[in-house]
């Protein structure tokens, strides 16, 4: 289920698979696939992705986007990027791209409500 409200055209800093969490690239206007929970992620690649560096890529920046799940996820959990740009559950002290709209397991394509933020440390 998706409801993409805001898409931003960027250039790929490297190949980006479809439905992957992305972060800013090395230059303005470029995006690369997310690689860690500490990344400053800003959206999710669309169904086309990008096959090589400098290819155009549309990034879903607002609304509900389809995203590749990289672990077991329960709807409502905050999601962050694993090493492959797939969605995994964000824990204390990690950044997140948004919240799961549906439950799923690794290999599923789920949905994320895009609302970037940070999970505070316990007691913070």
Language model region names:
Residues 1-124:
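Surface-exposed, low-hydrophobicity beta-strand/loop segments enriched in small/polar/acidic residues
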């Amino acid at each position: 289920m998706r409801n993409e409200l805001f898409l931003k055209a960027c250039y790929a800093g490297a190949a980006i698979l479809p439905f992957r969490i992305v972060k800013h690239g090395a230059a303005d206007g470029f995006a690369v696939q997310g690689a860690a929970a500490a990344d400053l992620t800003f959206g999710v690649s669309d169904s086309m992705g990008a096959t090589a560096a400098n290819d155009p890529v549309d990034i879903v920046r607002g609304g509900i986007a389809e995203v590749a799940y990289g672990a077991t996820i329960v709807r409502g959990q905050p999601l962050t990027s694993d090493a492959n740009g797939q969605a995994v559950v964000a824990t204390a002290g990690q950044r997140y791209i948004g919240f799961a709209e549906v439950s799923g397991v690794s290999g599923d394509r789920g949905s994320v409500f895009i609302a970037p933020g940070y999970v505070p440390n316990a007691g913070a």
